């Protein structure tokens, strides 16, 4: 870490120093005066929250974790593209139940990469009924949403998918499994 030099040095805010908050981007999102769809990807799961600004601290109105997909019978991994998409559908349905129909996407410090898991959550939220301003170019295509790339990789390296088989899912059946879980999530009102 570089030490402060000179009288004009300004110490960055704590969350900026920790690499957690980009305050310039946060201000632009807050000026929209809409709730934020906050998406965070961890090593094990996908987290999506609808967050509203409050002067004393942001308020989480609705929070969903990809582990909640297990309640609907999801047998796949919790942090891949299909799980992110299904998490997006679930957050949209729960937000609509709370009376929130629109939001702006907050990806934090994630790099906005076309077709990434962050945008898979966005696609799920939009298809689930949430209005979020976006460009269709960034959304992942249907084959990635359904997990066809995972099924194709399974054909090349079947020994890497022991966890799927322990949970009772053959990775080649993943696209059909995604469609099945999507149908269950879409009927939530």
Curated annotation (Swiss-Prot):
SUPFAM superfamilies: Translational machinery components (SSF53137). It comes from the Archaea. GO terms for biological process: ribosomal large subunit assembly; translation. GO terms for cellular component: cytosolic large ribosomal subunit. Gene3D superfamilies: 3.30.420.100. Keywords: Ribonucleoprotein, Ribosomal protein, RNA-binding, rRNA-binding. InterPro entries: Rbsml_uL18_euk (IPR005485). GO terms for molecular function: 5S rRNA binding; structural constituent of ribosome. Belongs to the universal ribosomal protein uL18 family. This is one of the proteins that bind and probably mediate the attachment of the 5S RNA into the large ribosomal subunit, where it forms part of the central protuberance. Part of the 50S ribosomal subunit. Contacts the 5S and 23S rRNAs. This is Large ribosomal subunit protein uL18. It comes from Archaeoglobus fulgidus (strain ATCC 49558 / DSM 4304 / JCM 9628 / NBRC 100126 / VC-16).
């Amino acid at each position: 870490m570089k030490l402060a030099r000179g009288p004009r040095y300004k110490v960055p805010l704590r969350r900026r120093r920790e690499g957690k908050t980009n305050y310039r981007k946060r201000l632009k999102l807050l000026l929209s005066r809409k709730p934020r769809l906050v998406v965070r990807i961890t090593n094990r799961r996908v987290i999506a929250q609808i967050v509203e600004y409050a002067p004393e601290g942001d308020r989480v109105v609705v929070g969903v974790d990809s582990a909640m997909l297990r309640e609907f019978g999801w047998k796949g991994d919790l942090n891949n593209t299909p799980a992110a998409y299904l998490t997006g559908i679930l957050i949209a349905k729960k937000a609509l139940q709370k009376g929130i129909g629109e939001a702006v996407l907050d990806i934090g410090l994630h790099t906005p990469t076309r077709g990434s898991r962050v945008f898979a959550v966005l696609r799920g939220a939009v298809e689930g009924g949430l209005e979020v301003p976006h460009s269709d170019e960034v959304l992942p295509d249907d084959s990635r949403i359904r997990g066809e790339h995972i099924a194709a990789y399974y054909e090349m390296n079947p020994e890497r998918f022991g966890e799927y088989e322990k949970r009772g899912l053959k990775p080649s059946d993943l696209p059909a499994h995604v469609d099945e879980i999507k149908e269950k999530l879409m009927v939530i009102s």
